């Protein structure tokens, strides 16, 4: 595995974790908050 490929995979994993964390937070907030903001 080349270093650039390893960096790409690690950045992809980090980005996926960030997106997953934001998605979970949004779901929790939307379930606990009954006021529709959209």
UniProtKB/Swiss-Prot annotation:
What is the annotated localization of this protein?
Plastid, Chloroplast thylakoid membrane
* Primary location class: plastid
What does the record list as GO biological process? Answer: photosynthesis
Q: Which Pfam families match?
A: PsbX
InterPro entries recorded for this chain? Answer: PSII_PsbX, PSII_PsbX_type_1_subfam
Q: Which UniProt keywords apply?
A: Chloroplast, Membrane, Photosynthesis, Photosystem II, Plastid, Thylakoid, Transmembrane, Transmembrane helix
* Transmembrane regions: 9-29
Instruction: Please give, as recorded in its UniProt entry, the membrane topology of this protein.
Output: Single-pass membrane protein
**An example Gene Ontology cellular component term from the record?**
photosystem II
Question: Which family is annotated?
Answer: Belongs to the PsbX family. Type 1 subfamily.
Q: What does this protein do?
A: Involved in the binding and/or turnover of quinones at the Q(B) site of photosystem II (PSII). PSII is a light-driven water plastoquinone oxidoreductase, using light energy to abstract electrons from H(2)O, generating a proton gradient subsequently used for ATP formation.
Q: How does this chain assemble?
A: PSII is composed of 1 copy each of membrane proteins PsbA, PsbB, PsbC, PsbD, PsbE, PsbF, PsbH, PsbI, PsbJ, PsbK, PsbL, PsbM, PsbT, PsbX, PsbY, PsbZ, Psb30/Ycf12, at least 3 peripheral proteins of the oxygen-evolving complex and a large number of cofactors. It forms dimeric complexes.
- HAMAP family reported for this sequence: PSII_PsbX_1
Q: What is this protein called?
A: Photosystem II reaction center protein X
Q: What is the native source organism of this protein?
A: Trieres chinensis
User: Could you read off the lineage of the organism from its UniProt record?
Assistant: Eukaryota, Sar, Stramenopiles, Ochrophyta, Bacillariophyta
């Amino acid at each position: 595995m080349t270093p650039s490929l390893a960096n790409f995979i690690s950045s992809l994993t980090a980005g996926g974790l960030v997106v997953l964390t934001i998605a979970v937070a949004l779901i929790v907030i939307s379930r606990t908050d009954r006021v529709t903001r959209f």
